[in-house]
């Protein structure tokens, strides 16, 4: 079945994989599961538009971390974290800018956030990055409890109308 194939392909625990009606649905489910109106969630300035939309539906505050030259700034994300922060949404590689932050910066981000803050790592376009400095998120999900990785079949496999995402 599909979940077993995903688990085998990405070396993930099949019991931690969920399928959804595209990444959009999974982003909304995550926001609704973890956010209350008194919470905050961080997203990047030029990130995926579904992030602030999903946050706002919950009544939580969407906090923007400014990019630098259209590239995610880990320092700016870290500077926006406070006691109300519950989620950080990060698209890497980023849509719509096409930029990505290297593995070292992703690891620095994750090791610098409080353990009660969840990093939602949207790697929808990961197959397009052919560089050893990139991390697709599988390693983070296998190592840490506060990371959720999102992927989709729509982009790489030409299945946009199918709306099939997983996390």
Describe the role of every protein-language-model region.
Residues 18, 42, 63, 120, ...:
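Structural detector of well-ordered beta-strand residues that form the stable sheet scaffold
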Residues 2-3, 27, 51, 74, ...:
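A general structural signal for well-ordered alpha-helical segments in protein cores
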Residues 12, 60, 117:
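Short glycine/serine/threonine/alanine-rich loop segments
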Residues 56, 74-83, 96-119, 123-156:
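Active-site pre-lysine segment of PLP-dependent enzymes
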Residues 16, 33-90:
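PLP-dependent aminotransferase-like
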Residues 2-40:
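Phosphate-binding glycine-rich loop
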Residues 1, 146-167:
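PLP-dependent aminotransferase class I/II
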